[in-house]
Amino acid sequence: MFEIPDIQLNQYGKPARIMFLAPYAPDAPDFSKKPYTGNGGYPQYHYNIYKAIQDIGYDVVSSSKPYSVQFAKGNVDYVFSLMNRFAMSRPEIFISSYCEFIQIPYLGAPPNIRAIAEDKLLTKMVFRSLELNVPEGIGLSGEKGIPAQAPFPGPYFVKKRFGAASGGIREDSICSSWKAVDSCARRLMEEGHEVLVEQYCEGIDVTVPVLGGENPVILGLSLIHISEPTRLRRIS
């Protein structure tokens, strides 16, 4: 068991003022949950986070616009950002970099660490330099093109080089041939993405949630269960 920490107070002795930023965060004036036609439940997820912070007792200002962070200095005490993907190059480091510039605390790792973590190819190279086992992989882009021959045996997993949360993953991301890799990689590159092709390997997806900084609370292992598409089962 662990104790929920007391509400953090600001320099005026009042509950800290928090700016909540997320692509589907509630916006003024009604701060209601937003509609969504894509896959996943991002509006509900972001709305739940907003309500949870508010229900704890914090003074929350919420926005779905990344440029709102420029109004943080002097108006809020902390930036709680889930603003990882939006229309700019390397968006995952924008909020943390700006918060560093205006010297205001924010959620998450420093921008240089985020830049490494969101670059799957660079992360793979870091792990390999530490002599950790990683699957074979190759980075592809429109400039480099796609090799005519497979550089390593399949089956293959094709994904965006940058980003997280399984963004862009579809059933055809699992490829049993290099011809299928070519098709999937070209689709991603036509959408403007660099690509990482890895050798597919079986495994499990385990997360260890950690809350807090100086005195973190480790919640234990969480095993992610995902329904496997027919194609994935066939090549496993």
Regions found by a protein language model. Name each.
Residues 80-81, 105-107, 134, 217-220:
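Short hydrophobic/aromatic-enriched beta-strand-loop microsegments
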Residues 75, 103, 153, 192-193:
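Residue-level detector of structured alpha->beta connecting loops
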Residues 73-76, 150-153, 213:
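A short, glycine/Asx- and small/polar-enriched loop/turn
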Residues 58, 96-171:
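A conserved helix-loop-beta module that forms one wall/lid of the active-site cleft
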Residues 1-106, 112, 141-147:
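ATP-binding N-terminal substructure of ATP-dependent carboxylate-amine bond-forming enzymes
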Residues 21-22, 159, 198:
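Short beta-strand segments
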